[in-house]
């Protein structure tokens, strides 16, 4: 039969799906981040007829759970992993919490530890000025809390 008249399944035209990349470095998590990973694994394990994508996601989240390291709280007077930071950048006041890769959501103010902004803030204290984006004193840290 001619190929023109043969119905091909949608499966034949799908692009191959690769494993989700594991971010480099230690998998530091906050208590909230660990809870999010655990709930993601539980939700995926509860699926009886999982698709290939869901199975791939489950492998990823199981790996992230197995390597999760609950980070100790940072010092109260300096920015560290898990800190809530209020600062000014370009004349605008912003607030962020520094979290692990899997918990990060910049639109919700949750910055990944390895992001350039978080890296600039690490170690700063209230009242400090920090270089960012090639500018000295681009950021003024207003407050640091847990």
Label each region the model flagged.
Residues 1-65:
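Helix-rich terminal scaffold detector
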Residues 72-142:
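Non-DNA-binding regulatory cores of transcription-related proteins
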Residues 62-75:
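Amphipathic alpha-helical coiled-coil segments
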């Amino acid at each position: 039969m001619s190929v023109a008249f043969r119905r091909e399944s949608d499966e034949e035209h799908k692009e191959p799906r690769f494993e989700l990349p594991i971010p480099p470095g230690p998998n530091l998590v906050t208590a909230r981040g660990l809870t999010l990973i655990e709930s993601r694994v539980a939700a995926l394990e509860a699926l009886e007829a999982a698709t290939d994508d869901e199975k791939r996601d489950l492998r990823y989240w199981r790996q992230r759970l197995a390597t999760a390291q609950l980070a100790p709280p940072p010092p109260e007077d300096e920015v560290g992993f898990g800190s809530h930071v209020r600062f000014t950048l370009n004349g605008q006041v912003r607030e962020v919490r520094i979290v692990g890769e899997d918990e990060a959501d910049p639109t919700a103010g949750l910055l990944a530890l390895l992001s350039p902004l978080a890296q600039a803030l690490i170690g700063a204290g209230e009242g400090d000025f920090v270089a960012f984006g090639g500018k000295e004193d681009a950021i003024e840290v207003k407050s640091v809390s847990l």
